[in-house]
């Protein structure tokens, strides 16, 4: 494919057309009576949805509400059992994603569909339905990445990318196809506040050119700022249509979950002794495209929640592996570079750190937090085997089931019981189980990565309250998250990791999202932190 095939923006705008006034426009997309039944659940039940040209339309609902199934039906990845799809006034069937793309429908999935052994450019090329030239495509990828504030190298192999960086690939891949309907599922979780504003400006420009946008997000402030209308789903059915700008956060949340959400219960912050102490930690990344840690120091006290913000790919993976015990020794750090409950732990393995009272919730739920094809009982064994689940080398299946049941009940995990497969749970329920599995072991120090990434507002509120309750019991908690709202909601102090360096530390009440956003771009300095050097670029 030639360069002009990718870079002719005027042609793309002409293809989308100028957005007509909503009252004059026939719907770009109309769904009537869409239903989809799976063996254990009715995912969609008589769903009707209308999206106009140039409209930014939100779809709201809890995990398991049927949003993802509906989007997959629109994109041709799932066939409905009943109902009618109209595209620009014509009744048709969307038999496959290729057919959807030919119509002009693009989708950014929350759960990624990338080949790990291929490069970014090769993965994007696979989504194109026409001949391509990898060199020209790489140039266009860089242009789009720069336009949208999505830092990604087309030559990198996907297996070397963090979760956040993989989402950037999905966004860029979709935008390269000049869609007439763009479906975006949680697209801003990897962006700084400044980059979110840039993305929103681009989406508004696309809408002004006539591109319709279906926007799925759990960030209610984003929906209120960006979206013209919203369809609310619960239990597979449409329960209402609203204009988000005329609603409050509380009313939108209540529409989603069917009841009002309780306010977070916080106690006065009276920090105790230091339970997690990191001093001058420098770790060389094993990944040639990774970000090495450079002289990172911080302390987390008993009864405190300490938050580290930052865009994915700035050393979070390296810090997490160093803290968890997965990476030790290779950094040639002294043993006391990491101290847990006063004990040198820098050269201890993961099991020895847990014996000191360390708990850990990884970023990836499926694959690291839980084995997809194993039951919840079996997954309990992964980190909680010290809870009398093993005796004289024998696994005690009854103890495993009892622990899993206790976790399910205590943390309101909605599933088919202790023998349900991990992969059968929604993201929110699996995350509640993984967090609960750690909390039930009564850790003294808990490190949590992305605790509510892709989780609905109900499950997110539950998880955050559990962390607040745990800190009130004297546990030292480190939360590494890209969700600024989350960090401001629950953290006592906050810092930013950018380019492998840690920013100054602030009391949460003494800073704001604008300052943290600048720090996420590497724009900080001073006695407690130094702006990233040329060798440690900040990924924004």
Predicted feature residues:
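Glycine-rich phosphate-binding loops of nucleotide-dependent enzymes
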Residues: 2-540
């Amino acid at each position: 494919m030639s360069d002009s095939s990718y870079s002719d923006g005027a042609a793309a705008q002409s293809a989308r057309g100028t957005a007509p006034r909503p009252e004059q426009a026939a719907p770009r997309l109309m769904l009537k009576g869409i239903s989809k039944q799976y063996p254990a659940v009715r995912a969609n039940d008589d769903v009707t949805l209308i999206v106009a040209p140039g409209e930014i339309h939100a779809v709201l609902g809890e995990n398991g509400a049927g949003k993802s199934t509906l989007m997959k039906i629109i994109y041709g990845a799932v066939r409905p059992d009943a109902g009618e799809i109209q595209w620009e006034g014509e009744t048709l069937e969307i038999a496959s994603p290729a057919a959807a793309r030919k119509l002009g429908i693009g989708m950014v999935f929350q759960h990624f569909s990338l080949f790990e052994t291929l490069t970014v450019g090769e993965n994007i090329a696979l989504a194109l339905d026409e001949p391509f030239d990898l060199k020209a495509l790489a140039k266009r990828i860089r242009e789009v990445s720069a336009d949208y504030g999505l830092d990604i190298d087309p030559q990198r192999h996907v297996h070397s990318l963090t979760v956040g960086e993989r989402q950037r690939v999905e966004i860029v891949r979709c935008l390269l196809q000049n869609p007439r309907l763009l479906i975006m599922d949680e697209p801003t979780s990897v962006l700084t506040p400044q980059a979110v504003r840039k993305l929103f400006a681009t989406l508004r420009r696309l809408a002004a050119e006539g591109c319709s946008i279906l926007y799925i997000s759990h960030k209610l402030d984003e929906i209120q700022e960006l979206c013209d209308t919203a369809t609310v789903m619960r239990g597979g059915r449409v329960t209402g249509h609203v204009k988000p700008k005329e609603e409050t956060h509380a009313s939108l949340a209540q529409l989603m979950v069917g009841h009002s959400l309780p306010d977070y219960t916080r106690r006065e912050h009276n920090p105790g002794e230091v339970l997690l102490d990191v001093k001058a930690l420098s770790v060389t990344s094993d990944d040639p495209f990774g970000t090495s840690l450079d002289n990172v120091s911080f302390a987390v006290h008993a009864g405190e929640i300490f938050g580290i913000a930052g865009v994915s790919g700035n050393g979070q993976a390296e810090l997490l592996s160093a803290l968890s015990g997965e990476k030790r020794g290779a950094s040639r750090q002294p043993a006391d570079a990491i101290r847990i409950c006063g004990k040198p732990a820098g050269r201890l393995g993961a099991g020895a750190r847990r014996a000191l009272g360390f708990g850990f919730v990884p970023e990836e739920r499926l694959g690291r937090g839980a084995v997809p094809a194993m039951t919840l009982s079996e997954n309990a064994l992964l980190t909680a085997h010290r809870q009398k689940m093993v005796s004289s080398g024998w696994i005690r299946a009854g103890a495993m089931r009892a622990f899993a049941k206790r976790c399910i009940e205590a943390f309101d995990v909605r599933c088919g019981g202790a023998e349900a497969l991990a992969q059968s749970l929604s993201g929110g329920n699996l995350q509640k189980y993984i967090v609960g599995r750690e909390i039930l072991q009564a850790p003294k120090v808990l490190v949590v990565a992305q605790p509510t990434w892709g989780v609905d507002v109900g499950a997110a509120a539950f998880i955050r309250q559990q962390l607040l309750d745990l800190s009130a019991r004297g546990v030292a908690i480190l939360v590494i998250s890209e969700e600024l709202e989350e960090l401001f909601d629950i953290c006592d102090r906050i810092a930013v990791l950018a380019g492998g360096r840690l920013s100054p530390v602030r009391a949460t009440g003494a800073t704001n999202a604008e300052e943290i956003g600048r720090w996420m771009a590497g724009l900080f300095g001073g006695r407690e932190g130094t702006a990233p050097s040329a060798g440690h670029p900040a990924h924004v």
